[in-house]
Amino acid sequence: MSLPGKFITLEGVDGAGKSTHVGFVAEWLRGQGREVIVTREPGGTALGETLRELLLHREMAADTELLLMFAARQQHLAELILPALARGAWVVSDRFTDASYAYQCGGRRIAAERIAALEDWVQRGFAPDLTLLFDVPPAVAEERRSSVRAADRFEQEAGSFFARVRDAYLVRARAEPHRIHVLDARQTIDAVQAEIARLLQDLT
C-alpha cells in the first residue's frame, strides 16, 4: 500500500520511556515542514479511547483483550491513520501492532499465528514506515514504572511478564531490521533523541 504520507510508530515496554520522545518526533518533523498527526494505541478515535478505558482498567480474558485491541486498531486505521496518510500527513503513533505481538503474544502467550491472522485481516499488508523500539533491561523499566502515576492493568503485571514482552519485541526487531530500529533507552534523553533525528533524516 503506497500512500503520500509516512507512518512512524514508537514501541517499548512500559517504563522504557518511549512516550517522552513522541513529542520530539512530532516537533522534529514539523520543523521539516510536515503536517504531523500524533496518536496512540489503544485509542486515537472516540471509539478507540472508550476501548482503551476497558483494556487498561477492566479484567478480561486474554483473547478478549487481543480482539478489542484489533477492533480499536481497525477503527484507528479507517478513521484517522489511513485518511491522514492519504492526504500526505505524517502520523506518529505511540504503539501499533508490534505491541500486540509483544504484549498479547509474548506477555499473554497467545499464539503468534492468531495475531498474524488478525493483522492480515485488519491491515491487509499495511505496516509502519519506521518503528522506533525503546529498549531497557526489565529492572530499569520496573524502577521507572514504580516512580510514576498509579499503575494500570498492564503496568501491574509481574516482572516476568515484562521480560517476555521485551523478548518478544526484540524478536520482532531481529525479524524486521529494515523497519524496526532498537534504541538503547538507558542513554540520556539527548543521546536518544540525536539517534532518533538521524533515523528521521534518513526517512525524509
Curated annotation (Swiss-Prot):
GO cellular component labels = cytosol
- Please indicate if the UniProt record lists 4Fe-4S as a keyword: no
Q: Which keywords fit this entry according to its UniProt record?
A: ATP-binding, Kinase, Nucleotide biosynthesis, Nucleotide-binding, Transferase
The biological process GO terms on file are:
dTDP biosynthetic process; dTTP biosynthetic process; dUDP biosynthetic process
Disulfide bridge partners, by residue number: none
Q: What is its EC number?
A: 2.7.4.9
Q: Can the keyword Ribosomal protein be found in this entry's annotation? A: no
What's its catalytic activity?
A: dTMP + ATP = dTDP + ADP
List, in alphabetical order, the Gene Ontology terms for molecular function in this entry: ATP binding; dTMP kinase activity
Record InterPro entries: P-loop_NTPase, Thymidylate_kin-like_dom, Thymidylate_kinase
* NCBIfam families xrefs: DTMP_kinase (TIGR00041)
Q: Which organism is it from?
A: Thiobacillus denitrificans (strain ATCC 25259 / T1)
Gene3D superfamilies per the UniProt record, alphabetical:
P-loop containing nucleotide triphosphate hydrolases
Q: What is this protein called?
A: Thymidylate kinase
Q: What's a Pfam family this protein contains?
A: Thymidylate_kin
Q: Which residues bind ATP?
A: 12-19
